[in-house]
Amino acid sequence: MQAYAREHGIAVHLDGARLWNAHVASGTPLRELAAGFDTVSVCLSKGLGAPVGSVLVGSREHVAAARVWRKRYGAGMRQTGFLAAAGRYAVRHHVDRLAEDHANARVLAAALDVDPATVDTNIVFAEVADPGAFVAGAAERGVRVMQLGPRAVRLVTHLDVSAEDAARAAEVLAALPR
């Protein structure tokens, strides 16, 4: 797709909502992960724990054009310094700790008989016979799980899930019928 876009003068954008996780899990520098894209957006709330926000990275021209479109769509905000400060803090202090989320996800994976080696970041996909019953059973015991389809569930660890929380959730999940 990138080659086609380049041939036709089309800019290529990377939705980097989980780019921080990919960076920490793979050890690949962010610059390398974003190579070949004209713009990249990175989320400051998913994983990093900022209250809101994303950052758009690109050339001055691309970012200026994005600001124009943001204004046209009425998406501008005023007095956002405190939110910017929270985002800056998250980038400075929460990127490296994403490895903890990844380790917690592997704990959940093991409880569900999912090979932990297949869990690269903070998201676990598992196959269960009755996802609706599984989700309900987990919820009754204080563990939130998302149904993905007729035989699949998804679990996500994050800044607010400690190693102790993951261990407790793993006990709950392991006891549920799958």
Tell me what each language-model feature is.
Residues 1-128, 132-141, 145-161, 165-177:
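Conserved PLP-enzyme active-site core in the AAT-like
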